[in-house]
Structure formats: C-alpha cells, structure tokens
Amino acid sequence: MIGGIKLRIMYSILNILYTNKAQSKLYALTQKDIEEALIADGEKWCERTVYNKIRALVKQGYVKEGLKKSNSNTFYLTSEGIEWMKEVEGDIENE
C-alpha cells in the first residue's frame, strides 16, 4: 500500500504525462516540464521529491525514459501506468 501523499504526487505526475500525451520516447516530458505543470495545477514540490517519485515510477514500470531533450532526461507514461491510474481512480470512486 502506498501512503496518501506519496500516492497523490505519483498520480499527479502520471496524470500530467497523460494529459500532455507523453506516451512514447518521442513525446516525453522533462522533469522541469513536470514540475512546471505541477505548479500550474497548484502543487508545489521540491525538485528532489519530484525526482525521487519519477525514479520510483520508472522502477515500478509506470514511466519510462524517453529521448534526451538537450541534456535533460525525458519521461513518458507506459500502458502499465495508465492501468494503475485507472485502478487508483476506481478506488477513489468506491470510497
């Protein structure tokens, strides 16, 4: 079971990738892009927290690294990530 705050930021990151159609190596977002989108959504997290959560999502297979953008790594949503988002949304609707 993932804790509430950890779950929220991980879901938010996946949702940002989903809404920005970052679903392939070519169409992927940098960590900075993700941080800016989080801020635009009213969520402010430190760079290290966002970095750690992205790494956790990569490790779980929900996110993969895309093609580099300048010197920055990019990230995109996998089909497993989309399925996990649907599961979380289903859990929330059932509460």
Please state what every model-predicted region is.
Residues 1-26:
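Short alpha-helical segments that sit at the start of domains
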Residues 79-95:
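Short, amphipathic alpha-helical interaction segments positioned at domain boundaries
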Residues 24-38:
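Short acidic, hydrophobic short linear motifs in intrinsically disordered regions
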Residues 58-68:
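A short, conserved structural fragment
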Residues 70-77:
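Minor-groove-contacting beta-hairpin "wing" of winged helix-turn-helix DNA-binding domains
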Residues 44-59:
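Short amphipathic alpha-helical interaction segments
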